[in-house]
Amino acid sequence: MKFSPPLGTPFGDRWSILLQAEALALQVLAAHGVPVADARILCSDQRTDLISTRYDRIGTAGARHVVPLDAVHDAFVPGPRRDWAATCQALAAQRRLPVDAAAQASALLQFGRLIGNTDMHFGNLSLVVGSPADAARGRFSLAPV
């Protein structure tokens, strides 16, 4: 769950718009078959909330093993970090990540750039361990900021 500062303030009003834009970004990705968390917006007179289902949970008591891309890069990719796509392509070349998951990370990077997201750091993409179909599933902060 994310929420805005109080509405009626410059930060609150800006964050309200960003949270709504993030929900729209998730809806666009879902409509095109990209596995993303279900998310909805709840607006009140005081705040805007973005409520999402965690992608790393299984039922009420379980969890998928996810690792942030920054940790995976540090463990397996020599050299400095460039972007999600470069790291995932290097992992695919090492056969540590399915090629289609690397392509999905590249598409997510391009989508983020298209919507003006300048916050695509390596903590905002996680890899699901042991699930090739969902390997690049963990996406955070798709807001155009």
Language model segments and positions:
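Conserved kinase catalytic-core segment
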Residues: 17-32, 82-145
